């Protein structure tokens, strides 16, 4: 006793398993006036190599993105990978080797704004004052989102041109925004 001269030996079949990386953003705070527009992961699939007894337990691979502050701009974060059983229990590997321990996740954070809609009149007669035109828009303003630098440059949302050379009374036009 006191002198243990034994070795544990594990016999198993070594396999490879490839899993898609799922991104979760449950632990992020997005600042007021901003939205998380999209997430992109640098590596979409991860390959594991190890004993089948360990790999058989794994159902999902997750990159759980965390950030300590409020997000107001796009950012890329190195995010550790976590593996779960089909029942949601985290799997800790003893013998399995990971192709990657973490992945880079890019979070596209966009600023939101409500902007007045603006139409442009083209082919008007010379010295024509388009402020004298009476017209109605189905929407006076629209909510938009985009990179903060672009949104901050906008004071109105241009939705298209109305060609006065082809204009007729009671005409209804559509502009896709």
Locate predicted features.
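Structured interface patches
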Residues: 1-174
């Amino acid at each position: 006793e006191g002198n243990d001269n034994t070795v544990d030996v594990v016999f198993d079949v070594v396999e490879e398993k490839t899993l898609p990386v799922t991104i979760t953003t449950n632990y992020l705070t997005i600042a007021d006036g901003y939205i998380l527009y999209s997430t992109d992961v640098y590596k979409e699939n991860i390959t594991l190599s190890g004993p089948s007894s360990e790999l058989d337990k794994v159902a999902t691979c997750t990159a759980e993105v965390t950030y300590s502050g409020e997000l107001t701009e796009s950012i890329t974060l190195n995010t550790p990978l976590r593996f779960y059983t089909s029942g949601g229990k985290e799997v800790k590997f003893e013998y399995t080797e990971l192709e990657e321990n973490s992945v880079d996740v890019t979070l596209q954070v966009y600023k939101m704004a409500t902007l007045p809609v603006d139409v442009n009149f083209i082919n008007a007669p010379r010295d024509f004052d388009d402020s004298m035109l009476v017209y109605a828009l189905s929407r006076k303003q629209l909510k938009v989102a985009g990179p903060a630098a672009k949104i901050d440059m906008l004071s109105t949302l241009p939705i298209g041109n109305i060609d006065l050379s082809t204009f007729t009374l009671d005409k209804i036009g559509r502009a896709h925004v």
